[in-house]
Amino acid sequence: MDKQLNDAPCGFLALSEEGSIIAANRTLIKILDYEPEQVIGQHMNMMLTIPAQLFCQLYFFPLLKLEHHIEEIYISLKARDGEEIPVLINAIARHDSGASVFDCVLIPMRKRNEYENELLIARNEAQEALLAKQKANAELEIALETLKAKQEELLEINKQNQQFKLNTKRELELARKIQKNSLTEPIVNDQVQIDSYYNASSELSGDLYGYYQIDEHRYGIIILDVMGHGISSALITMSLHPLFQRQITQGLSPVKVMKELDRHLHSLFQNDEEARHYCTAIYLEIDIARQRIDYVNAGHPPALWQDDSGTQHLLHATSPPIGMFEDLEFQSSSLSYTEDGRLLLYTDGVMDPTASCYLFDLLKDHPDSPIADLKEKILTSLQHQKEAHHKSDDECFILVDVK
């Protein structure tokens, strides 16, 4: 590395395709308070906060491999003493001796407070200059010039911050639309009627669902809830979506579907145990011809089956959440029915925080209500619950009429 790059007023980092650090300039190593031998050869995760590790794994590296360049990505570094250092990253992908190398420039963003303090110092100096008549003219001129320069720097930083916020807002809005468009449409035929509701507590949600007609007589229904909220949870749900969509439409059993989702979650975090997320989920396969429901409930709130007589059966958890334990053996259960009935699946955002799911009573009190009317009653009840308990959580539920 040449001297100019080594001592540049910004950090420089060269990474392998797997994220290992090939080179780092003195400026970056000094910012992080490491020795060169403590950095070179290590994975980039050593200098990232946990959210930044997840962001890089699920967004930064895939996007860089796809686009071959990235501009003004905001993440937080972690110094040796644990201090978080906000930076903007510009990166390009290149080939060196047949291998992919990612060159990154890291620009620290922690100078704003320093600039504000310098402005206060400059103002005090100007006041002192006015009181000291013998130095007033010269010192006042210096102070005013300093103040002007610092104001311009602060305005530029504010401009950059505002642009970053606008860019982030646009990206989140696009991600929200993509997430919403991935949800399945209602199904209505002479065998079943399926409808759903989905509402994110923020721009992005950790809840996701899907339902599909597998063949002439079978239907697959799944609902998931990734721990946490916001971007990290939403990125994980979106990585699970194409996987369970393919498996369900291929007619894989509930046990095999859950096993593949569990394997996928473990593969996401195999190099970073601290960033690991788990996910509760329940998958049901309804066989109309056999009048049977096979399901696996992985740590999810129990689904409800209510038959025409009003009798309710809870489909309790049969296994721990996916992504929690390696080599987990999932257990399936079955429910046979002889008459028409109604299913309710939901995430914990629609549960009463002081009791069991109050929606069970609502279904029992309105056994003959069409699904559309029942959905409106549930939404009204949800609104009352939010107002009473000041709740703010992702909300998702599915209603199924089996005819």
Swiss-Prot record:
Disulfide bonds: none annotated. This is Phosphoserine phosphatase RsbP. The keyword Hydrolase applies. Keywords: Hydrolase, Manganese, Protein phosphatase. Its EC number is 3.1.3.3. The gene is rsbP. GO terms for molecular function: L-phosphoserine phosphatase activity; phosphatase activity; phosphoprotein phosphatase activity. Its cofactor is Mn(2+). The keyword Signal does not apply. Induction: Induced by entry into stationary phase, but not by carbon and energy starvation. Residues 191-402 form the PPM-type phosphatase domain. PANTHER family: PHOSPHOSERINE PHOSPHATASE RSBP, STAGE II SPORULATION PROTEIN E-RELATED. Residues 1-42 form the PAS domain. The PAS domain may participate in sensing the overall energy level of the cell and communicate this information to the phosphatase domain. Positive regulator of sigma-B activity. Dephosphorylates RsbV in response to energy stress. It catalyses: O-phospho-L-serine + H2O = L-serine + phosphate; O-phospho-D-serine + H2O = D-serine + phosphate. PROSITE patterns: PAS (PS50112), PPM_2 (PS51746).
